[in-house]
């Protein structure tokens, strides 16, 4: 058992809507959970990023999310409207691991895909942030002012940098490669018996793992999904 409690808005394997390992753990009651609306997760991370104890929000009002999470509190607006809002607590992270397209050794990063997801909030909400990067380059190669648009957070937030080409596999890292659907299906099926999958792919060096799935060239040739 690796996880004691999981706070989440949605758990999937991208192209596979229901994550089978997560489903199995929930059905067996092996983990404590706090299921939230995705907007509440975002607001909790934002509160942590701003070093606030909570942020008021309308997200979650009128839903069973609050019924199933009685620890969540309400707050009343101090202004004339006196609106009742959810006081979403900060989701303070001990550690964040973020995969990026490029970085230098100092922690300057670039995320060039079309959707940065919550990566910036993860970095700001965490006590320590570690970066795995497709490419580790010199600071000059990040492009100066022209490349700054792809830098989502300051290097001062970064604790360490790891060079991990194809490090997002079997998920995608746009624009370099897409989802490895075949591998995701294999991983999903492994919920029935994880030992075989573990022996085949885990407890290896990064390069050994890449080789076990066909090598970097195979991964880099996986097409990006079209939405």
Q: What is each PLM-predicted segment?
A:
Residues 1-227:
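Conserved alpha/beta enzyme-core scaffold
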């Amino acid at each position: 058992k690796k996880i004691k409690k999981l706070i989440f808005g949605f758990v999937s394997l991208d192209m596979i809507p229901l994550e089978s390992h997560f489903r199995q753990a929930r059905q067996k009651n092996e983990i404590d959970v706090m299921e939230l609306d995705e907007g509440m997760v975002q607001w909790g991370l934002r509160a942590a990023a701003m070093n606030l104890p909570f942020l008021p929000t309308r997200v979650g009002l009128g839903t069973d999310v609050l019924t199933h999470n009685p620890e969540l509190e309400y707050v009343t607006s101090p202004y004339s409207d006196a609106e009742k809002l959810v006081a979403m607590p900060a989701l303070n992270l001990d550690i964040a691991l973020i995969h990026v397209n490029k970085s230098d050794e100092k922690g300057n990063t670039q995320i060039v895909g079309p959707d940065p997801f919550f990566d910036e909030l993860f970095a700001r909400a965490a006590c320590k942030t570690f970066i795995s990067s497709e490419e580790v380059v010199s600071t000059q190669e990040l492009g100066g002012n022209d490349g700054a648009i792809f830098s989502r957070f300051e290097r001062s937030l970064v604790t360490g940098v790891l060079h991990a080409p194809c490090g997002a596999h079997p998920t995608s890292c746009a624009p370099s490669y897409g989802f490895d659907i075949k591998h995701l299906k294999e991983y999903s099926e492994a919920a029935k018996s994880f030992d075989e999958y573990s022996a085949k792919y885990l407890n290896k060096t990064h390069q050994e793992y890449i080789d076990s799935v066909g090598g970097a060239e195979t991964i880099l040739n996986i097409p990006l999904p079209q939405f």
